[in-house]
Regions:
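Acidic/hydrophobic-patterned starts of short beta strands in beta-sheet-rich repeat architectures
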Residues: 29-39, 92-102, 150-159, 207-216, ...
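Beta-strand signatures of extracellular beta-sandwich domains
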Residues: 46, 109, 166, 222, ...
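Blade-edge motifs of beta-propeller repeat domains
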Residues: 1-17, 51-80, 114-138, 171-195, ...
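Blade-level signature of beta-propeller repeat domains, shared across WD40, Kelch, NHL, RCC1
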Residues: 254-291
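Loop/turn-rich, solvent-exposed surfaces of beta-rich toroidal or solenoidal domains
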Residues: 201-202, 209-211, 215-225, 230
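Short, composition-biased motifs enriched in small/polar/acidic residues
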Residues: 290-361
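Residue-level signature of beta-propeller blades and closely related beta-rich strand-turn architectures
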Residues: 39-41, 51, 102-104, 114, ...
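Beta-propeller blade termini
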Residues: 20-27, 83-90, 141-148, 198-205, ...
Length: 361
């Protein structure tokens, strides 16, 4: 997957301030993507209902998310934090709930949906705990619920203001999670630290069947590739995700300070895109796209230079298998724009062939 140059603004100028933290979800159960955005200085969560289609979302006005008693969900934050929304069925009752990471103290709050997916009504927030103690990552928590160890129970991954990512294992049930003490996620054999203000999402970025981490921080957007298994992920060191810019090659994605990432297939074309919030309250959309190889040039040393229609100035080199000198117009899919290695699939041959490729600098 390659990310389009530049990015398009989805909802510039969030109400009341900046530090936008986006979450894409079908909030009202109408089959279309909606957008939740945590924002400062108000410390609230804006709900943008989709007035377009699922493949072509359109947003105009917003409302602030409220609990069932009519009060706005509110999480004040000192400095440059904002409430970080995450939507999932947290208690296993088949309905979407809301989790919110608090900027000021690094806690995570659970707002239970007491009504339906078509018309969510949220109970007052309850802080998550580790044993009898309040769960916290210190400051600027950004929760992500996922079954990290594939034991059938949803765990919690959480970014933090210090740039580390913590794994809280669910040791109880899907209906009543109980979390073990935090364990730092490792990448490249050391504790993963993305700089400051880390956000982490789980997605199979390179299409090899293994879940990876797609992350962001103040310094960029990153991919941590899983080289082991889904039940026991072993992550490579973070690699910067870039976008092709004509005349400049691959350039790291930057939307401004305080980048917060959310991967989603925004336009329903089967390729993952990136939605990014920043410090100025703007939410950007970077489109991932399939592309078709336009030219294959065999080179010495079991390598081949590939050129494609959307970015002919980029070269990739085959690192394994024989040089595919007889391929004409192969289709490449799910090729990440960042990182040293990935896979691409030749769909023209009778049998699919897979090659490990590397950006030729």
């Amino acid at each position: 997957m390659t990310i389009n140059d530049g990015g398009a603004a989805l909802c510039p100028g969030n109400p009341g301030g900046g530090y936008a933290i986006p979450c894409v979800t079908d909030w009202n159960g109408d089959g279309k993507k909606d957008l939740l955005v945590g924002y400062q200085l108000a410390g609230k969560i804006a709900l943008y209902l989709n007035l377009g289609t699922d493949a072509q979302p359109c947003f105009t006005n917003h409302t602030n998310l409220k609990t069932g008693n009519g009060s706005d969900i509110y999480h004040p934050s000192s400095g440059c934090g904002a409430p970080a929304p995450w939507v999932c069925d947290f208690d296993g009752d088949g309905k979407r709930d809301l989790l919110v990471g608090a900027g000021s103290d690094g806690t995570v709050w659970f707002y239970r949906n007491t009504n339906t997916d078509a018309a969510p009504i949220l109970a007052p927030g309850v802080q998550l705990k580790v044993g009898a103690n309040i769960l916290t990552v210190g400051i600027r928590s950004t929760p992500c619920i996922t079954d990290w160890d594939e034991d059938g129970l949803n765990d919690l991954l959480c970014g933090a203001g210090d740039g580390y990512v913590s794994f809280f294992k669910n040791t109880n049930t899907a209906q009543s999670p109980i979390y073990a003490p935090a364990v730092k996620i490792q990448a490249g054999g050391v504790d993963l630290n993305l700089g400051i203000r880390s956000v982490v999402r789980v997605f199979d970025w390179d299409g090899n069947g293994l879940k990876d981490l797609v992350c962001s921080s103040d310094t960029g957007v990153y991919w941590c590739r899983n080289t082991n298994s889904n039940s026991n992920p072993v992550l490579q060191a973070p690699q910067t995700i870039c976008a092709p810019v004509s005349g400049s090659g691959l350039v790291p994605i930057v939307t401004g300070a305080r980048m917060r990432v959310y991967p989603v297939d925004w336009n329903n074309d089967g390729v993952m895109d990136l939605v990014l919030g920043n410090a100025y309250g703007t939410v950007y959309y970077y489109e991932g796209y399939h592309f078709r190889i336009s030219h294959v040039t065999p080179k010495t040393g079991n390598k081949v230079a590939l050129q494609w229609d959307s970015a002919p100035f980029l070269n990739y080199s085959v690192l394994t298998n024989d040089c595919p000198i007889n391929i004409q117009y192969p289709a490449a899919t799910n090729l990440p724009s960042g990182g040293n290695t990935t896979t691409w699939t030749n769909q023209i041959q009778g049998d699919q062939q897979f090659f490990r490729v590397q950006i030729a600098q």
